[in-house]
Amino acid sequence: MSGNESVVNYDHFIDKRRVRKAFERAAPLYDQAAVLQREVCDRMLSRLEYIKYMPDVVLDAGSGTGYGTCKLLERYPDASMLAIDIATGMHHQARQRMNSMIPRWRQLFGVGRNQRTSRVRYVAGDIEQLPLEDSCAGLVWSNLALQWCNDLKKTFDEMRRILKNGGLFMFSTFGPDTLKELRQAFRHADDYSHVNRFADMHDIGDMLVHSGFATPVMDMEYITLTYDEVISVMRDLKAIGAHNATGARHRGLTGKNAWQKAIGHYETLRTGGKLPATFEVVYGHAWKPAPRTSILTPETRRHIGLE
């Protein structure tokens, strides 16, 4: 796929209503299973150490339960924060997290409550269609949320729209090898899609350029989690709301025979008594360039026929 194309494969089309419901259900216990999300967030934060830039407004796009939001507030103590998520239940958990960071005696007497919480505005919405005005943020931060977008090019256009000139877009998402073991296991079981599809790092970089971003920097790494049983992999995915929401998914329950075939194939991958679950994590950042200004005077432009 070329970077300037915007094509949606409806077999891989993500049902946003299903995604929202999954995250609403997952919100209360999300943090118990979101080990990978926190780890990737911390690795993104370490990358920020090398970028000397102080935004006045930060957008956490796909803010979840607020782990990254709190970290960004600490890093940018003078910035205000916009936290957008598709599930309002995630915002409820984020507010609880924020309040838990205030000492109990301060909560009882109302001292210091507004010093942190008043800097955060929670917004319910889809990051593919941001309900925000143009040029409102200096930094757009998105940790493991872009994989839920149907049209990445459109999403990048939105990120550029709401960024201020000279602003930074920093993100992580999943690459094609994510959950490759699970995908291969079910490929031996039936013809349905059981794992969402993920964009290639190089395609993502191309789309950033075609969306008007400057100097994109991309890299990736593999992170492998290990489990005792296949069912534990599925439970963790369910606990973080990571259901398969594509159009090609099975609309009913996976049959017993298909399930047993999938388990049997997955078991052949057991190493050292553990089953692997691989995640290809793609990192990227790019800048919204300032508009180009002509060095030609109006008189010169008229003289050479440009006006």
Swiss-Prot record:
InterPro entries: BioC (IPR011814), Malonyl-ACP_OMT (IPR050602), Methyltransf_11 (IPR013216), SAM-dependent_MTases_sf (IPR029063). Keywords: Biotin biosynthesis, Methyltransferase, S-adenosyl-L-methionine, Transferase. It holds the Pfam family Methyltransf_11. SUPFAM superfamilies: S-adenosyl-L-methionine-dependent methyltransferases (SSF53335). It comes from Nitrosospira multiformis (strain ATCC 25196 / NCIMB 11849 / C 71). The gene is bioC. It comes from the Bacteria. This is Malonyl-[acyl-carrier protein] O-methyltransferase. HAMAP family: BioC (MF_00835).
